UniProtKB/Swiss-Prot annotation:
It is a single-pass type II membrane protein. The record marks A93, K94 as: Cleavage. It comes from the Eukaryota. This is Sperm acrosome membrane-associated protein 3. Residues 1-69 are cytoplasmic. Residues 91-221 are extracellular. Residues 94-221 form the C-type lysozyme domain. The processed form is expressed in sperm (at protein level). Expressed strongly in testis and epididymis and weakly in pancreas. Belongs to the glycosyl hydrolase 22 family. PANTHER family: LYSOZYME C (PTHR11407), SPERM ACROSOME MEMBRANE-ASSOCIATED PROTEIN 3 (PTHR11407:SF25).
Length: 221
């Protein structure tokens, strides 16, 4: 059983043969659930073929018609969650100093991991992101490179637009905050690939085979 709130609406309708218009007061109903006919008030004061009555019934039918849902509920919540994570990530972004980043990497055990010393990792981070945890680079195919190591959404992390394997099992926005844990754990997984740090073009072009001691010189661990 529905609940109705009545109201009166002013309706301008042609009621004379000469085309004159009269103002009629018709009682309408705004309905919630199952309720009365909202056009009932016009039925008693207009001819059966009145254009105003016809329009009223059309509006009533439209109001009762089910509305098309633009997005499935799951997609809507996913979009909201992704947007929220983007906002949170941007609020926690940080640009590290050289020694500050070297210490973080040292504490996470990157020095010597898979045969690469700490300077390799610091050099990589500089030439990929400039030590900026919030760095995002957009590729022509729609994929993104994310965070301090510019980890690609093609294979390693997930965005709303990507259908990649997400091998690190994280959202790409998780790589954009000043807590480096997700970025480092994912990078450690990437470096297990046959190319090692050679997976990153920046490391091959700027760091590989060079004296990198300056990257950690003067840093206190």
């Amino acid at each position: 059983m529905g609940i109705c709130m009545s109201m009166y609406t002013q309706v301008l309708v042609p009621v004379d043969a000469d085309g004159d218009h009269h103002i009629l007061w018709s009682r309408f109903y705004e309905r919630w659930g199952s309720c009365f006919n909202p056009c009932a008030g016009l039925v008693n004061c207009l001819p059966p073929h009145s254009s105003a009555l016809y329009l009223c019934h059309r509006m009533e039918a439209r109001s009762r018609a089910p509305r098309r849902q633009l997005c499935p509920p799951g997609i809507t919540w996913l979009a909201l969650a992704y947007l929220l994570s983007c906002l949170l990530a941007s609020s926690k972004a940080k640009v590290f100093s050289r020694c500050e980043l070297a210490k973080e990497m040292h504490d996470f055990g990157l020095d010597g991991y898979r045969g690469y010393n700490l300077a390799d990792w610091v050099c990589l981070a500089y030439y990929t992101s400039g030590f900026n945890t919030n760095a995002v680079d957009h590729e022509a195919d729609g994929s993104t490179n994310n965070g301090i190591f510019q980890i690609s959404s093609r294979r390693w992390c997930r965005t709303l637009a990507s259908n990649g394997p997400n091998l690190c099992r994280i959202y790409c926005t998780d790589l954009l905050n000043n807590d480096l844990k997700d970025s480092i754990v994912c990078a450690m997984k990437i470096v297990q690939e046959p190319l090692g740090l050679g997976y990153w073009e920046a490391w091959r072009h700027h760091c590989q085979g060079r004296d990198l001691s300056d990257w950690v010189d003067g840093c206190d661990f």
